[in-house]
Swiss-Prot record:
Gene Ontology terms describing biological process: translation
Organism of this sequence: Pyrococcus furiosus (strain ATCC 43587 / DSM 3638 / JCM 8422 / Vc1)
Gene designation: rpl15
Keywords: Ribonucleoprotein, Ribosomal protein, RNA-binding, rRNA-binding
Pfam families attached to this UniProt entry: Ribosomal_L27A
Protein function: Binds to the 23S rRNA.
GO CC annotation terms, alphabetical: cytosolic large ribosomal subunit
Lineage summary: Archaea, Methanobacteriati, Methanobacteriota, Thermococci, Thermococcales
Name assigned to this protein: Large ribosomal subunit protein uL15
Subunit structure: Part of the 50S ribosomal subunit.
Length: 147
């Protein structure tokens, strides 16, 4: 059996170590700059790459409102009011007055939305109503009161 030592190719004495000309194995200069250099407005050396792979790299995108200006609108659906009317009565949010049930939504929400349907006439007090919610409240024989 022939035992031959494995030849290890470490390129000793090679001037360029497989990179061709010496200049080709230099830093970012041979690549058009390091990283995203050349993708900007002025030096468009990598412009075709930018357009294909990073089209959103340039330009303005949106605006963030300051947190102190932002206000979360708490919403409630008609479905919730109709299903939980007994609980709202016990909590004192809804009460009966002159044969009508009045629900004061302002204690836990800002706006009433129109998902679901009302099974009985209610007078609902809120800061805002969606058009669909107002329509459904009136169709059930109730009243939408802006506070």
């Amino acid at each position: 059996m022939i035992r031959r030592r494995k030849k290890v190719r470490k390129l000793r004495g090679s001037h360029t170590h497989g990179w061709g000309c010496k200049k080709k194995h230099r830093g970012g200069g041979s690549k058009g700059g390091r990283g995203m250099a050349g993708t900007g407005k002025r030096n468009k050396s990598k412009w075709t790459w930018t357009i294909k792979y990073a089209p959103d790299h340039l330009g303005k995108r949106g605006f963030s409102r300051p947190p102190e200006v932002q206000r979360e609108v708490r919403v409630v659906n008609l479905k919730f009011i109709d299903e939980h009317l007994d609980e709202l009565m016990q909590m004192g949010i809804a009460y009966e007055e002159g044969g009508k049930i009045i629900v004061d939504v302002t204690q836990f929400a800002d706006k009433v939305l129109g998902t679901g349907k009302l099974t009985r006439p209610l007078v609902i007090k809120a800061r805002a109503f969606s058009p669909k919610a107002e329509e459904k409240i009136k169709a059930a024989g109730g009243e939408a009161v802006l506070v």
